[in-house]
Amino acid sequence: MMNVNAAYAEKCVTPDEAVTLITSGSHLSMGMFAAEPPALLNALAKRAKRGEINDLRVYCYETASIAGNTIFRYELSDYIHLYSMFITGIERALIRQGIESSGRKIVNYVPSNFHQATRLLADDIGIDTFIHTVSPMDKYGYLNFGTGNDYSTRIARTAKKLIVEVNKYMPRVHGEGAAIHISEIDAIVENHVPLIELPIRTAVAEDIAISQIIASLVPDGACLQMGIGALPELICNALKEHNDLGVHTEALNPGLVSLIQQGVVTNQRKNIDRGMSVFTFAMGQKDMYDYLNDNPSFFSRPVDYVNDPGIIAQNENVVSINATLQIDLTGACNSEHLLGHQYSASGGQLDFVRGAYASKGGRSIITTRSTAANDTISRIVPRLEGPVTTPRTDTHWIVTEFGSVNLKGLSSTERALRIIELAHPNFRQQLRVDAKKMHLI
């Protein structure tokens, strides 16, 4: 029988020693958000600064401040190359810095739907080394991926090398593949620091109106998916009088956890994973992370399961709620591109748009405020300025602060007229002119 404590001690090294396993010219990936390992990333940044590593490609999703303050700094961009599947403020800042400093492109965007991330990383890209923050080892020799199942639990096992950072603040989360044995790990570092937390954003009046409209579209017994931010929190608050809701979501947020604690979410009407709130990654604050710890009502699963439209559709009355940046007069949505640059990503939006509509009684909801930049720019546009994230043929419900519309079954003329009604009044007349020029009305 393996002595797990001896194995742990043998593999426990300093961060500087651990990152020597990461070689020049290799492909590295890491955990998302709170699962980014700060000690390892800091040691890796120091190696790059000393010129000890070159041409390292880092493939990531939902980059957080830990990576932004260490390996993803402009001065290291000659040595460490960023390949992002989901653009955040970290990448946007680097994009601006690259343009302003040298005109050089230093952020590479990898288009994908989130449910494909595991296959892309394992088969198409090929990850050499994977790094992740984990909870401490139990007496049986298992550590836990905590807040990040997503692609992590799969890639940790397909990468050539696995380095973990043990942190007592990382919760132990029940889930598929969430526990990993000491025998599967190449190196361990210890670093007990509080996990990074999701910032609390201030709501605006338009979001309050949108949240009320969306809540009215959610029936009792619905199975929910939504994202992260001020609007999802408002929507959750507006759902507190609902009954028997379920959770099958890409992102677990504080609002959903609050509904679970209040008994609004029971998961008893789900066809699959009944009784459990299923998610693929969690982002919140310390109290939420503490509530997740060893809580059997939560179950994390890999993203190729959670975001698979065929899996999503197995539950009835799925309601997916996602945001967009632009909606055109045909119903197509651009949720990722702004002012000529990649601003966000496709993420799991299309996964859940398709899965929700395929669900019996399900509906997908795409939402946006009607304007941006202090009401000077309309988010309802004649034609999209960027790529299509959700095609017009997939768009179901659209919601702005001015109302909602179900586009399914409407002609192109009916769509254009109804979408214009959701635009800010200051832009409706011009949109009607544009619609006529496009022969939509």
Where are these regions (language model features)?
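Conserved alpha/beta enzyme-core scaffold
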Residues: 1-441
